[in-house]
């Protein structure tokens, strides 16, 4: 009978009077694939740190079975800043690389006529067996493939000059090549584009060890997880199946719990209705939004009462017939062309998902729309009635010494958002900042907290055309669902850069996709429909191979 990799028995974790995990019992076997969900601050990352041995439980037991190895991808992973990207990743091979080096040394020693051939042959045979078992003969090839698939920086790049996203990709690459028996991933899809995420899903499907992933990426959980573990108010609730199955089972649990979770049940019902609907029905619903602008705008005008227990987007000024038109636009920096001969028309009530790898010009497109970057040629026409809401992702104007509430509210108890007076404490709380979190200094916020603050700053501008740059990064599933529902009810337009496929399927009426290649690296494609419909269209236009990740030339088989 197989041994459990890890066990927790009646485990409790607290910090002073604050209980994070309470009376938790769990165990799992090698090969388990588990997705961990729950609101931010409920202890998901703490659970992973306990499994990794970085934290200890206050009471009870938490034990990694002797003989098994464990590795963790943290939200801010530690790397050796004195080494290059390649040197950091090569540390993953450790003992295997040493065995390969020793194997080669033996070959040289056997050229000596005085060598002890029997002893050397015995050592060589043992080393060969161990290297074969670890698939250790092509380490350089594995390294190159994994770095390419995850878009790691050049191997000679010093780690100390890498951005936060680059460091995470380097750390993830190193961890996957280490191939621990228990692989712990905290938001593994952050800072990955759609092609890298697809590669990671395929890699984890073949992974022999146990995988525990904290992630907000619901398609990732649908495609990888065989169990969902929900962390809620100190307790763990296991659900057999993937994320869609979890939604079904949790809905039944909430029915039993009754009205105390009425708002959560309503939000869950909205998502569950979407999951149960056919792809054609989803597409029809998204398309129908384009014809309902007048109705949605009138309803928003007549309903001035807002409930900021969830994210709300008040209606901006009424849109005219023209919102945004791109006519043969071209954008280049010197010889580097990012956008070439792109034309599209954004209709009223349209929500556009902008997709493509990092560095192909998505954020540059936003800067051309708001006038921060000039076009090289072509024309961008913005309607006279359009008011744009946009905050630059660099956020250079924010005072790091102001607390979060002050930065968003300007120190006012009430602010006006699109003609509606809003209590600022409640407004900030709707983005997941409760109580003492509102007093955190802007300069020390985590990446996820800065992202939510950026979203609050953008939406308070009261525009009717929202430009949102990666709003889904580091949001928990509940906040994501709240944002999705707010966008679906918003009478206006949005252009959203995101790699979250579930999010784009639910809200997008159009997709603007980078489809560049060696011949035309600045090619973009405008499509009416959501993400899934776009993917089907892409296969129909370009063939089945278009849906596969192209960075992976040969599968990794180690681990």
Per-range role (PLM):
Residues 1-262, 308, 312-559:
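ABC ATP-binding cassette signature C-motif
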Residues 249-282, 286-292, 296-303:
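Intracellular alpha-helical coupling/juxtamembrane segments of multi-pass membrane proteins
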């Amino acid at each position: 009978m197989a041994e459990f990799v890890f066990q927790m028995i009646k485990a409790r974790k607290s910090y002073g009077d604050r209980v994070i995990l309470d009376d938790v019992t769990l165990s799992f076997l090698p090969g388990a694939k588990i997705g961990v969900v729950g609101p931010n601050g409920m202890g998901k990352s703490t659970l992973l740190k306990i499994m990794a041995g970085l934290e200890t439980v206050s009471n009870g037991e938490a034990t990694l079975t002797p003989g098994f190895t464990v590795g963790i991808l943290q939200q801010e992973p530690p790397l050796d800043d004195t080494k290059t990207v390649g040197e950091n990743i090569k540390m993953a091979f450790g003992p295997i690389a040493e065995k390969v080096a020793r194997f080669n040394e033996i070959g040289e020693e056997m050229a000596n006529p005085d060598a002890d051939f029997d002893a050397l042959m015995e050592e060589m045979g043992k080393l060969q067996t161990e290297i074969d078992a670890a698939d250790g003969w092509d380490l350089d090839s594995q390294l190159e493939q994994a770095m390419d698939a995850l878009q790691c920086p050049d191997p000679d790049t010093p780690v100390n000059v890498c951005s936060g996203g680059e460091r995470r990709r380097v750390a993830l690459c190193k961890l996957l090549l280490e191939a621990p028996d228990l692989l712990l991933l905290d938001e593994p899809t952050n800072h990955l584009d759609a092609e890298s995420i697809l590669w990671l899903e395929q890699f984890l499907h073949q992974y022999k060890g146990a995988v525990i992933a904290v992630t907000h990426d619901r398609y990732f959980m649908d495609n990888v997880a065989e169990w969902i573990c929900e962390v809620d108010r100190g307790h763990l609730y296991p659900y057999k199946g993937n994320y869609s199955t979890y939604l079904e089972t949790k809905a039944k649990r909430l029915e039993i719990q009754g009205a105390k979770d009425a708002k959560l049940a309503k939000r869950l019902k909205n998502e569950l209705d979407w999951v149960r609907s056919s792809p054609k029905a989803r597409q029809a619903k998204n398309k129908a939004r384009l014809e309902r602008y007048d109705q949605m705008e009138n309803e928003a005008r007549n309903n001035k009462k807002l409930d900021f227990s969830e994210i709300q987007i008040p209606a901006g000024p009424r849109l005219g017939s023209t919102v945004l038109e791109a006519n043969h636009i071209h954008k280049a920096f010197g010889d580097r062309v990012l956008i070439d001969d792109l034309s599209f028309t954004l209709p009223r009530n349209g929500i556009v998902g902008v997709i493509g790898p990092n560095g192909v010009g998505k954020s540059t497109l936003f800067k051309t729309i708001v006038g921060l970057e000039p076009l090289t040629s072509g024309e961008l026409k913005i309607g006279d009635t359009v008011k744009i809401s946009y905050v630059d992702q660099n956020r250079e104007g924010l005072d790091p010494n102001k607390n979060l509430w002050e930065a968003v509210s300007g120190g006012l108890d009430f602010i006006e958002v699109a003609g509606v007076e809003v209590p600022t404490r409640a407004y900030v709380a709707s983005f997941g900042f409760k109580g003492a979190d509102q007093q955190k200094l802007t300069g020390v916020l985590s990446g996820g907290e800065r992202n939510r603050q950026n979203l609050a700053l953008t939406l308070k501008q009261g525009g009717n055309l929202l430009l949102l740059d990666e709003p889904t990064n580091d949001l928990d599933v509940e906040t994501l669902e709240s944002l999705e529902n707010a966008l679906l009810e918003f009478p206006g337009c949005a252009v959203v850069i995101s790699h979250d496929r579930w999010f784009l399927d639910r809200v997008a009426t159009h997709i603007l996709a980078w489809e560049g290649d060696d011949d035309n690296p600045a090619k973009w494609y405008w499509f009416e429909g959501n993400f899934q419909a776009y993917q089907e269209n892409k296969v129909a236009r370009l063939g089945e191979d278009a849906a596969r990740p192209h960075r992976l030339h040969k599968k990794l088989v180690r681990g």
